[in-house]
A protein has these predicted regions:
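Acidic, metal/ion-coordinating pockets
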Residues: 1-165
Length: 165
């Protein structure tokens, strides 16, 4: 099983690189599942649009994670509820649109992959305690019980918080 995880796809240059190179990388290295952080993928580097997300999915990306810039484009608020492959941080305040974790199948349906998107609390607005949220989710998505693989994307601003996660 090969999972490719790519960090912040930045603006049009990042998207162009993904569109140009990713299909060949998937084929050459026999990648089974692709996760990218796409919260900075718009032309101005802040947020993501429905069109960009759809373009990513067509390129071979299976899941898009995010962070504090997820709401920088207004259209994301309505789109994220209907698109399970676009995640927002799970520890955003209760009632936030979308979802912060999900279980996915590989394209061949051979494996189940749990993906959890979390965001640090330092210098971030409108977040719940990241560690408490991680504990709650860990009771729902259990490695080797209901998923074969588990990936956690932690988006944070300071090193000490990332190290603690």
């Amino acid at each position: 099983m090969k999972i490719l995880i790519l960090g912040d796809i930045m603006g049009s240059s990042g998207r162009n690189a993904i569109n140009k190179k990713l299909p060949d990388i998937i084929k050459k290295f026999k990648i089974d599942f692709v996760i990218v952080n796409g919260e900075n993928a718009s032309d101005d580097g802040r947020g993501i649009t429905k069109a960009i997300a759809e373009e990513f999915f067509q390129t071979g990306i299976d899941v898009i994670t995010s962070g504090n810039h997820i709401w920088d484009k207004d259209e994301t608020t309505s789109y994220i509820d209907s698109e399970k492959r676009l995640l927002r941080p799970a520890n955003l305040v209760a009632g936030s649109p979308g979802r912060g974790h999900e279980i996915y199948f590989t394209k061949d349906k051979k494996y189940k992959i749990g993906v959890i998107n979390l965001m640090g609390n330092i210098f971030m607005r409108k977040t719940e305690d990241v560690f408490q949220e991680a504990k709650k989710i860990s009771k729902k998505i259990i490695l080797k019980k209901n998923v074969d693989f588990l990936v956690v994307d932690f988006h944070g601003e300071i090193t000490s918080e990332k190290m603690a996660a």
